Amino acid sequence: MIFSFRIFKADKFPKIRVDFTFLLLIAPLFLLRDRKNVLDILLVCGLHEWGHLAAMAAFGVKLRAVHLSGFGIRMITKKSGTEPLLKSIVILLSGPAVNLLLFLLMGRKVPETAMLSLGACLYNLLPFSQLDGGAVLELLISGSVHEYALRMALRLLRMALFALSAVLVYCYGYALLPLSGAIFALCISERQSHSP
């Protein structure tokens, strides 16, 4: 179930698309009794997205749409088709960079928020095209002489990450089940988006 809406009904504002999986992702947040945890999660995610927006503003990139899904928030830009590779990579990595900076700045003072920020950084650097790290890899692989071999290696890496996450759930308990489930869903989504 997907629904879309626009902010302010004007074409100059970005289109917002909300996927049902996003609602499934955030629903458990409202079940948490500790409001600080909810605020920490929203802060970490908000600053991550602010990092992308700040880099886009610095490069003069216009935002066309925002897609909220269970995998996170994807910002779709107005592309001319001739964007420099380095500019795209900087924009993609600016979100995880903000999370890493937040982790370094808050490490000892606010360890819970710092660890959430580090987790967001590492999650977003996973090699799935819906995430920042995977999008960077897609940019680097596309058009490469060894594109087919690199895509196969990337597919194997994704499967290995899922297997590792399953082993971690087995060894360390169900607290890691959401991460393993997210990696499994990303693997399935990746498979569907690259199938003929």
Where are the model-predicted features located?
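Hydrophobic transmembrane alpha-helices and their immediate loop junctions
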Residues: 1-196
